[in-house]
């Protein structure tokens, strides 16, 4: 599809491509996601996000000041209708190392989960264990997952609304088996950017609902809520994402994060203090970060 773009669309896509690469590069730098000599297992589901992640990491690898290796891994869970030939054929054209892991988790899930119930939770646990094991077998030092900015915010609201916790997806963590470091290089990337990127790059997308299970209804509701906010209040999503990067524990209520008990008149003003008897002064418009790629010229797409 890239070859079919007119000059204006090609210019627009070039800005998009530069923005996504910069987003990923910034996340890698901010959280020290990739280090010299790392071997990254890029988990490839066949969806737009993981395809984009692999594509961008391959691009960054070619120009990075450090050396690291990539190996793309897909788990074939033997779902009916899964097109087994698509990923091997596509990955072979890229020249990237890859491994297709075949494990019939579909039959296990269908046997254990009652008809009509969502299979996602059990399927996810089984998949996670297999991928952790595969990373060890391949000698990988990091596991890269394709969660993006919108996934992170959705998880934040899910935990707030349904779990009573101020908690989201970490950009980097140690896996629950204690043997792997998991990274999310797309943490700063917008889903709508990834959708457009996948369309132009014409990735061979594989449907995610081959098992017949439906996405978590609570997550669907949160996603729709955020999309509605984005339409009605442009910039609010960006402001919310900025907020979780600028947390002030002294102005929240978690005494495990801040020692409120020891505060007295000699403590001084903490984090700007608070005008206790005045109404809060809040901006009337969202704090928009102007994307420098929207005002800078860019190189042409080749």
UniProtKB/Swiss-Prot annotation:
A motif (PP-loop motif) lies at residues 45-50. The thiolation reaction likely consists of two steps: a first activation step by ATP to form an adenylated intermediate of the target base of tRNA, and a second nucleophilic substitution step of the sulfur (S) atom supplied by the hydrosulfide attached to the Fe-S cluster. Its EC number is 2.8.1.-. One of its GO terms (cellular component) is cytoplasm. Catalyzes the ATP-dependent 2-thiolation of cytidine in position 32 of tRNA, to form 2-thiocytidine (s(2)C32). The sulfur atoms are provided by the cysteine/cysteine desulfurase (IscS) system. Gene3D superfamilies: HUPs. Transmembrane segments: none annotated. Pathway: tRNA modification. Binds 1 [4Fe-4S] cluster per subunit. The cluster is chelated by three Cys residues, the fourth Fe has a free coordination site that may bind a sulfur atom transferred from the persulfide of IscS. It is found in: Cytoplasm. It comes from the Bacteria. Disulfide bonds: none annotated. This is tRNA-cytidine(32) 2-sulfurtransferase. It catalyses: cytidine(32) in tRNA + S-sulfanyl-L-cysteinyl-[cysteine desulfurase] + AH2 + ATP = 2-thiocytidine(32) in tRNA + L-cysteinyl-[cysteine desulfurase] + A + AMP + diphosphate + H(+). The gene is ttcA. [4Fe-4S] cluster binds at residues 120, 123, 211. One of its GO terms (molecular function) is sulfurtransferase activity. Its cofactor is Mg(2+); [4Fe-4S] cluster. Its main location: cytoplasm.
């Amino acid at each position: 599809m890239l070859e079919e773009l007119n000059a204006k669309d090609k210019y627009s896509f070039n800005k998009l491509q530069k923005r996504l690469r910069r987003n990923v590069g910034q996340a890698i730098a901010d959280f020290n996601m990739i280090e010299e000599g790392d071997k990254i297992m890029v988990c490839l589901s066949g969806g737009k996000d993981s395809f984009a992640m692999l594509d961008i990491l391959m691009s960054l690898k070619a120009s990075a000041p450090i050396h690291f290796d990539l190996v793309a891994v897909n788990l074939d869970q033997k779902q009916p209708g899964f097109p087994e030939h698509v990923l091997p054929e596509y990955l072979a054209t890229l020249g990237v190392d890859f491994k297709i892991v075949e494990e019939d988790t579909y039959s296990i899930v269908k046997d254990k989960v009652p008809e009509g119930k969502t299979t996602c939770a059990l399927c996810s646990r089984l998949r996670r264990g297999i991928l952790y094991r595969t990373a060890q077998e391949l000698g990988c030092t990091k596991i890269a997952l394709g969660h993006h900015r919108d996934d992170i915010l959705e998880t934040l609201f899910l935990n707030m609304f349904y779990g009573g916790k101020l908690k989201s997806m970490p950009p980097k963590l140690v896996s629950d088996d204690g043997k792997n470091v998991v990274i999310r290089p797309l943490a700063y990337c917008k889903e709508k950017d990834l959708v457009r990127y996948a369309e132009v790059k014409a990735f061979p997308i594989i449907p995610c609902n081959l098992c017949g299970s439906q996405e978590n209804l609570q997550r669907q509701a949160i996603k729709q809520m955020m999309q509605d906010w984005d339409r009605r209040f442009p910039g609010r999503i960006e402001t919310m994402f900025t907020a979780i990067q600028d947390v002030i524990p002294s102005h929240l209520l978690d005494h495990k994060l801040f020692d409120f008990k020891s505060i007295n008149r000699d403590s001084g003003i903490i984090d700007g203090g608070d005008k206790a008897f005045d109404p809060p002064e809040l901006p009337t418009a969202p704090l928009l970060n102007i994307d420098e790629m929207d005002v800078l010229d860019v190189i042409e797409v080749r």
